[in-house]
Amino acid sequence: VKMSKSLGNVVNPDDVVKAYGADTMRLYIMFIGDFEKVATWSDEAVKGSKRFLDRCWNLMDMASDSEALSEKNEAIIHKTIRKVTQDIDELKMNTAIAALMTMVNEFYANGLTKGDLKMLMLMLSPFAPHMVEEMWELTGEAAKTGTMAMQQPWPEYDESKTVASHVEMAV
């Protein structure tokens, strides 16, 4: 469906920002698809973007105090750094966000450390900068580094760590 004032189906971005926040609007616009293609607006999908950001926020309460990457999450973190880096370079924001969603699901399944959460915050920062800066402050990273999350260097992946150290197989 094409948006048009004459059809009365235009979405006012101010209303979306007021209801869900600027980061949700920003994330949703980047998630709905390629910038060069027509995309269909979906209020339900906007709510899904908000749920994803809420899930990221709630990870702060789950993270253990370790600054190291957890063994269970190390491979998915390095795969995600590789994927998000490549996708941003190719302006494929939707697939970069999808990779972050997959990683967050793994964090919920495996648990996470503060080190794992820090990697998520750094990769999520271009998509939800306001929320990430709040998280950066609340997790003590701002005090520890003396910088904002957006001032940190982009994380680098180690190709050798993109493969899981062990695989469980049903017999």
Across the structure, where does each feature detected by a protein language model lie?
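Active-site and channel-lining beta-strand-loop segments
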Residues: 1-8, 167-171
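Helix-rich, typically C-terminal accessory recognition domains appended to large enzymatic cores
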Residues: 15-171
